[in-house]
C-alpha cells in the first residue's frame, strides 16, 4: 500500500447473493488502483471464496437469529458486543476510506461501528425486499443503493453489480435472429438444484409432440444430477443431442446467451444477470425465501412483460407444456428485448463510483 492509495473495505457474507456482487465491485476498485480488504465471517462461504480472489480478509463472528433456538437469542447481547468490538478492531487496522456493505448478518455490527467511527458507509441492497440489517443501517449510511426500485426509501437505483462478461453480451435481436430450428431452453436449478424444476420439466417435455420439443440444457446441481437423469429416463428421454444434463455450468454468460428461454428460480442475482444478457425467462420463485423476496424479484420483470412468473404451487407438467406450445422464437425475442431494456449493465461501475465519491476521491480514476 502506497501513502496515496485509498482503501475500500467490503463487508458481505453468508450467501453468494451477497458475496459475488461484492467481488465484482472489489475487482473494479482494484483495477482503478484501490486497495481492497474484505470483512466477513470465518464460518461463511466468503472465508473460502474471497482469498481465492487475492483479497485479504478481516473476520467478525456474528450470525443471525432466524430459526435459531432460545440459547442463541439469549446470548445475542454478548455476541453483538463482541462482534462490535471485533469490527472496531478491524476498522482500526485497515483504516478504510470508505466501507461498502453488501449484506449478510456481519454487516450489522460492522456497519454500526463504521458509522460511529466517522467513516463513510455505503450500503447496497440486492433484493427487491430489503433485509432487516440494511433497513436499520440505511439510517446510518452516507449513500444507499438498491438493485430494484423501491427496495429502500430514498435510495438510488443502481442495479446489481455483475460480472463483466454478462454485461457485454451481444444484443438480443442479433442473437435470436441468427437462429433457426427448435427453441433452445436452459433450465437452471442453481448450485443446490431445484427439485420442482427437475421433476416437472422432463414430464412437460414428454407431453409435447416430437416436433414441438425444444433443445434443452438442464443444470441440476451436483447432488441432484443422478436423480435428474432418472427423471428424464422415466419420461422417455435419453440424454443426447437435444437433452443435455449437466451438474454445473462454468460459463453462465455463454449459457444465457445461447438460450432462447431460461426456466429458473428468481434470486436477485439470477434476475439481474438475465436482464443484463437479455433473455426470455420463466421464473418459478423459491416459495420459502425470506419475505418471499423471490416473487417480488421476478415480478419486476414479469410486470413489464419481460418474463413470466409461475408460483411453484401452480407449476405442473401440463401447464408448462401448454405454455411452451404457445411460444415462438419471435415472442421470446420480444420478451428478451424488454428484459434488456430494464437492465443496469453498468451497475458495477456505478457502485464503484459512488464508493469513490463517498471517500472524496477523484472519479476520473474509475473511468
From Swiss-Prot:
<comment type="similarity">
    <text>Belongs to the glycosyltransferase 28 family. MurG subfamily.</text>
</comment>
<keyword id="KW-0472">Membrane</keyword>
<keyword id="KW-0997">Cell inner membrane</keyword>
<dbReference type="GO" id="GO:0051301">
    <property type="term" value="P:cell division"/>
</dbReference>
<feature type="binding site">
    <location>
        <position position="294"/>
    </location>
    <ligand>
        <name>UDP-N-acetyl-alpha-D-glucosamine</name>
    </ligand>
</feature>
<keyword id="KW-0808">Transferase</keyword>
<keyword id="KW-0133">Cell shape</keyword>
<dbReference type="GO" id="GO:0005975">
    <property type="term" value="P:carbohydrate metabolic process"/>
</dbReference>
<feature type="binding site">
    <location>
        <position position="191"/>
    </location>
    <ligand>
        <name>UDP-N-acetyl-alpha-D-glucosamine</name>
    </ligand>
</feature>
<keyword id="KW-0131">Cell cycle</keyword>
<dbReference type="InterPro" id="IPR006009">
    <property type="entry name" value="GlcNAc_MurG"/>
</dbReference>
<dbReference type="GO" id="GO:0030259">
    <property type="term" value="P:lipid glycosylation"/>
</dbReference>
<keyword id="KW-1003">Cell membrane</keyword>
<dbReference type="InterPro" id="IPR004276">
    <property type="entry name" value="GlycoTrans_28_N"/>
</dbReference>
<protein>
    <recommendedName>
        <fullName>UDP-N-acetylglucosamine--N-acetylmuramyl-(pentapeptide) pyrophosphoryl-undecaprenol N-acetylglucosamine transferase</fullName>
        <ecNumber>2.4.1.227</ecNumber>
    </recommendedName>
</protein>
<feature type="binding site">
    <location>
        <position position="163"/>
    </location>
    <ligand>
        <name>UDP-N-acetyl-alpha-D-glucosamine</name>
    </ligand>
</feature>
<feature type="binding site">
    <location>
        <position position="249"/>
    </location>
    <ligand>
        <name>UDP-N-acetyl-alpha-D-glucosamine</name>
    </ligand>
</feature>
<dbReference type="Pfam" id="PF03033">
    <property type="entry name" value="Glyco_transf_28"/>
</dbReference>
<comment type="pathway">
    <text>Cell wall biogenesis; peptidoglycan biosynthesis.</text>
</comment>
<dbReference type="Pfam" id="PF04101">
    <property type="entry name" value="Glyco_tran_28_C"/>
</dbReference>
<comment type="function">
    <text>Cell wall formation. Catalyzes the transfer of a GlcNAc subunit on undecaprenyl-pyrophosphoryl-MurNAc-pentapeptide (lipid intermediate I) to form undecaprenyl-pyrophosphoryl-MurNAc-(pentapeptide)GlcNAc (lipid intermediate II).</text>
</comment>
<dbReference type="GO" id="GO:0008360">
    <property type="term" value="P:regulation of cell shape"/>
</dbReference>
<keyword id="KW-0573">Peptidoglycan synthesis</keyword>
<keyword id="KW-0328">Glycosyltransferase</keyword>
<dbReference type="InterPro" id="IPR007235">
    <property type="entry name" value="Glyco_trans_28_C"/>
</dbReference>
<feature type="binding site">
    <location>
        <position position="127"/>
    </location>
    <ligand>
        <name>UDP-N-acetyl-alpha-D-glucosamine</name>
    </ligand>
</feature>
<dbReference type="GO" id="GO:0051991">
    <property type="term" value="F:UDP-N-acetyl-D-glucosamine:N-acetylmuramoyl-L-alanyl-D-glutamyl-meso-2,6-diaminopimelyl-D-alanyl-D-alanine-diphosphoundecaprenol 4-beta-N-acetylglucosaminlytransferase activity"/>
</dbReference>
<keyword id="KW-0961">Cell wall biogenesis/degradation</keyword>
<dbReference type="GO" id="GO:0009252">
    <property type="term" value="P:peptidoglycan biosynthetic process"/>
</dbReference>
<dbReference type="GO" id="GO:0071555">
    <property type="term" value="P:cell wall organization"/>
</dbReference>
<dbReference type="GO" id="GO:0050511">
    <property type="term" value="F:undecaprenyldiphospho-muramoylpentapeptide beta-N-acetylglucosaminyltransferase activity"/>
</dbReference>
<keyword id="KW-0132">Cell division</keyword>
<dbReference type="GO" id="GO:0005886">
    <property type="term" value="C:plasma membrane"/>
</dbReference>
<feature type="binding site">
    <location>
        <begin position="15"/>
        <end position="17"/>
    </location>
    <ligand>
        <name>UDP-N-acetyl-alpha-D-glucosamine</name>
    </ligand>
</feature>
Amino acid at each position: 500500500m502506497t501513502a496515496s492509495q485509498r482503501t475500500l473495505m467490503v463487508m458481505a457474507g453468508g450467501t453468494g447473493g451477497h458475496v459475488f456482487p461484492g467481488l465484482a465491485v472489489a475487482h473494479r476498485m482494484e483495477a482503478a488502483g484501490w486497495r481492497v480488504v474484505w470483512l466477513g465471517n470465518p464460518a461463511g462461504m466468503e472465508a473460502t471464496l474471497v482469498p481465492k480472489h487475492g483479497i485479504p480478509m478481516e473476520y467478525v463472528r456474528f450470525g443471525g437469529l432466524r430459526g435459531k433456538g432460545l440459547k442463541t437469542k439469549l446470548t445475542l447481547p454478548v455476541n453483538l458486543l463482541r462482534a462490535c468490538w471485533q469490527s472496531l478492531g478491524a476498522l482500526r487496522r485497515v483504516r478504510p476510506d470508505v466501507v461498502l456493505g453488501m449484506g449478510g448478518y456481519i454487516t450489522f455490527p460492522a456497519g454500526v461501528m463504521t458509522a460511529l467511527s466517522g467513516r463513510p458507509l455505503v450500503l447496497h441492497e440486492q433484493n427487491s425486499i430489503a433485509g432487516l440489517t440494511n433497513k436499520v443501517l440505511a439510517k446510518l449510511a452516507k449513500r444507499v443503493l438498491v438493485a430494484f426500485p423501491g427496495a429502500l426509501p430514498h435510495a438510488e437505483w443502481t442495479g446489481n453489480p455483475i460480472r463483466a462478461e454478462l454485461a457485454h453480451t451481444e444484443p438480443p435481436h442479433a442473437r435470436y435472429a441468427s437462429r433457426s430450428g427448435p427453441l433452445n431452453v436452459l433450465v437452471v436449478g442453481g448450485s443446490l438444484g431445484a427439485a420442482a424444476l427437475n421433476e416437472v420439466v422432463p414430464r412437460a417435455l414428454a407431453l409435447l409432440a416430437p416436433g414441438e420439443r425444444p433443445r434443452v440444457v438442464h443444470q441440476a446441481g451436483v447432488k441432484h444430477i443422478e436423480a435428474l437423469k432418472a427423471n428424464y429416463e422415466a419420461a422417455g428421454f435419453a440424454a443426447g443431442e437435444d437433452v443435455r444434463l449437466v451438474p454445473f455450468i462454468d460459463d453462465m454468460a455463454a449459457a444465457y446467451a445461447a438460450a432462447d428461454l431460461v426456466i429458473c428460480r428468481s434470486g436477485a442475482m439470477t434476475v439481474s444477470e438475465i436482464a443484463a444478457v437479455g433473455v426470455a425467462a420463466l421464473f418459478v420463485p423459491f416459495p420459502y425465501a425470506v419475505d418471499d423476496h423471490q416473487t417480488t424479484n421476478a415480478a419486476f420483470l414479469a410486470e413489464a412483460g419481460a418474463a413470466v412468473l409461475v408460483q411453484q404451487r401452480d407449476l405442473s407438467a401440463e401447464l408448462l407444456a401448454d405454455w411452451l406450445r404457445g411460444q415462438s422464437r419471435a415472442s421470446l425475442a420480444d420478451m428478451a428485448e424488454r428484459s434488456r431494456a430494464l437492465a443496469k449493465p453498468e451497475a458495477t461501475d456505478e457502485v464503484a463510483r459512488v464508493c469513490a465519491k463517498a471517500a472524496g476521491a477523484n472519479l476520473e480514476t474509475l473511468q
